[in-house]
Each structure stands twice: as structure tokens, then as C-alpha cells.
A protein has these predicted regions:
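Alpha-helical transmembrane segments of multi-pass small-molecule/ion transporters
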Residues: 2-314
């Protein structure tokens, strides 16, 4: 028992060291966003650049060049859908059990099942190289539209039109599907085009992590809330950081998977919630301040939980 505990501790420390460069980039983004004259408009513009240009370039290029077998990856992809589906259901249970403020619930429930893709892709690349990155991209290609639809449906009562089209035109989904199609067809890009896309993709992870740090809320006005709001905050955080990775661990024992697939699945499920939850909530008339606190709590708490989950699965 003592030996097993020592092994787990060593693996957790190894994972902490693996996470350290990404945590440092997030911390740098936080520092740069505070008091240096770069206002919110700068960071919003940078986030758009990452989301619409740099990140899609990274995904497309990684999947296009990776030795993929979509058929053999079907078990891990199906497991990811099941885990995220369970997270959506568990998140929605808070409305029935806690009877919280409807607007605050609709705004915050997305944090129980959405994931921070910038951190996920950065860590997947460090764990499994291009193969890990490509596998993570394949999972994201399925999960991104799934969680976006669930998040939008929760906020739909306050939303305007056009959101279904926005989901269908999601740049990350389009890049992933395009890369998978090109890979299946054996597409080889001309060298100048390939080099240009590679350079754009190289800038994606570091820039994306900087925007995550810039979006963290360290101090804000307290939300007008009650016990149900506090309970809901804990509920969403527990679902995202504890229950979803636990379900992913269970899936790895029930479904045959390669070692890298097991690791990426659990890592994917253990990720903190998406920093863009705040953007969606505010654009659809929700409680943006509450969501900003949820995002920050998830990011900070994940520094303790992610190393443990990865140590358990590796």
C-alpha cells in the first residue's frame, strides 16, 4: 500500500512538472493583462485571432499529417461522447435538486461539461506528441458541437437568432473535419502552403494559453446570491473536475483502448471548463460575472486535480 501511494505521488509530481510550462503561460497572460495598458479590447481581439485563425490551422495541420485510423479510434470517441453526455445530465440535475436562480443556472451549467481546449491541446501534445494532439482534436471535433448545443439550449430563452448557424460553422469543428477528410484522402499540400499553416499553428498554443490567463477573474464584486448559488457552484465544479474524469476512468476499464487513448480520454475529461463560457453567457444575456468566477475556480482547482487523474491513468 505504501509503495502504491509513493508511486502515485511520484506520477502526480511528474504530471505537475509536465503542466508547469502551460501553467506558466497562463500566469504570464494574467500578469500581462493587469495594469500595463493592454485593455480588454486587445485581449478580445487576440482571442478571436486564436479562435478563428491560429487554432484551426493547428488542428487541420496536426490531423492532416497524423497517422490516424478513425475506425480503430471509434471506441475512445464513443466513450468521450458518453462521458460528456453524462456530464451534461449531471449538470442539468442541479436545476431540479437545488432550485437555483434560473438565469444564473442557465449561465453556469455550461461550466459543468465544457472544456478548455487551449489547455487540452497543449497538454495532449506534451503527453503524446503529434499523435496525442491529433487524437485530442478528433475528440474535440465530436464534443465541441455537442457541448455548444447543450450550452446554447440552456441560454436559449435569452438568446437572439443565428446561434444554430454559428454552431454549424464553428471553426474548430470545420478544421477538424477538414483535416480528417484530407487525411483519409491522402491530401498533400504544396510546401509553401504547408509551411504557412504550420507557422500559424505553432503560434496557437502559447497565444491561446496567454488568453486563458488574461480571462481569469482574481477579484470581482461578490455575486448577489444565496445558499443555492453556493451549492450550485460546488456542484458544477465537482461534476467537471471529479465526476467526469471518474467516469472516463471507468470507461477505460470497460472499453478496449490503447494506452495513449486511455490517457487522452481521462485528460480530456479532467480539463477545467472553457474560458469562453463567459463570452457565451454575456452574449446571450446571462450572468457573466457569475460565470467568470466559475471559470476561474475551475482553472485554479484543476491545478490540483488534473495531475492526480493523469497519475492514476498513466
Amino acid at each position: 500500500m505504501a509503495a502504491a501511494g509513493a508511486t502515485l505521488h511520484c506520477r502526480a509530481m511528474e504530471t505537475m512538472l509536465l503542466l508547469l510550462p502551460d501553467v506558466a503561460m497562463v500566469a504570464l497572460g494574467l500578469l500581462l493583462s493587469r495594469g500595463n495598458g493592454w485593455d480588454r479590447r486587445f485581449w478580445d481581439g487576440l482571442e478571436k485571432l486564436v479562435y478563428f485563425v491560429l487554432f484551426p490551422a493547428l488542428l487541420f495541420n496536426s490531423i492532416l499529417k497524423a497517422p490516424l485510423s478513425i475506425g480503430s479510434a471509434a471506441p475512445v470517441m464513443a466513450s468521450a461522447v458518453a462521458v460528456v453526455g453524462a456530464g451534461i445530465v449531471l449538470g442539468w440535475l442541479a436545476a431540479r435538486v437545488l432550485k437555483p436562480d434560473p438565469v444564473r443556472f442557465a449561465s453556469g451549467v455550461q461550466t459543468a461539461f465544457r472544456f478548455n481546449s487551449y489547455v487540452a491541446f497543449a497538454l495532449a501534445q506534451r503527453i503524446g506528441g503529434e499523435a496525442g494532439l491529433a487524437l485530442c482534436a478528433m475528440l474535440a471535433g465530436i464534443i465541441v458541437p455537442m457541448v455548444n448545443v447543450a450550452a446554447v439550449l440552456a441560454l436559449a430563452r435569452n438568446a437572439g437568432g443565428g446561434w444554430w448557424n454559428a454552431i454549424l460553422r464553428n471553426p474548430l469543428v470545420m478544421a477538424t473535419l477538414g483535416g480528417m477528410a484530407g487525411n483519409a484522402l491522402g491530401l498533400v499540400l504544396p510546401e509553401p502552403v504547408s509551411a504557412s499553416i504550420t507557422r500559424l499553428g505553432t503560434a496557437a498554443l502559447a497565444t491561446g494559453l496567454l488568453t486563458v490567463g488574461a480571462g481569469l477573474v482574481i477579484k470581482s464584486e461578490p455575486a448577489a446570491g444565496d445558499r443555492s448559488t453556493t451549492s450550485m457552484t460546488v456542484w458544477f465544479t465537482v461534476v467537471k473536475l471529479l465526476l467526469m474524469p471518474a467516469l472516463a476512468m471507468l470507461a477505460t476499464t470497460l472499453v478496449p483502448m490503447a494506452p495513449l487513448e486511455r490517457t487522452i480520454l481521462v485528460m480530456f475529461a479532467a480539463m477545467p471548463t472553457a474560458s469562453t463560457c463567459y463570452i457565451l453567457a454575456t452574449r446571450m444575456g446571462g450572468d457573466g460575472a457569475y460565470v467568470a468566477r466559475l471559470v476561474t475556480l475551475s482553472m485554479v482547482a484543476s491545478l490540483a486535480t488534473v495531475p492526480v487523474w493523469l497519475a492514476l491513468v498513466r
